[in-house]
Amino acid sequence: MKSEVLSNTIDQFDKILAKSKSLFLAKSRDYGPSWRVLRPSSLTDQLYIKAARIRSLEQKKNQKVEDDITGEYLALINYSLMAIIQEEYGFTEDHLDVSMDKLQHSYEQLVTDTRTLLEAKNHDYGEAWRMMRVSSYTDLILVKLLRIKQMEANEQENLVSEGPKS
């Protein structure tokens, strides 16, 4: 049973990340790597805006702008991966400094690393996260983003924190 649930989790992860990657690549074709000019704090703010909108919609139970909430979650995934890529390459005024092939490779490597971490955490936690409410995920995302904003304010000089990537 446990193996079946984990298999289902990995299948779900793979499907969601395939959608995220498809969206990332499509937007990259449309806009190029224009996001490379974003500073880390700007990416954190973009993530915060997306998570805050999700929370607002969860509380209001209706929306006036009919954007699919799934799209907001996909945006959270892609902005998160972009933020980690920015950490690797640094932001730049010359958004064409790194080829799209390299950026795509970095994206794919991060997805692979995340998948491996998911498998390890599921082993240790026994998929307890499946019992959580979706609204709890939203709250946890917001808490993590507020922590990252504080780390940025501290200029990454943290006493005990592992840093934003964790």
Which residues are covered by each model-predicted region?
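Intrinsically disordered, low-complexity regulatory regions
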Residues: 1-166
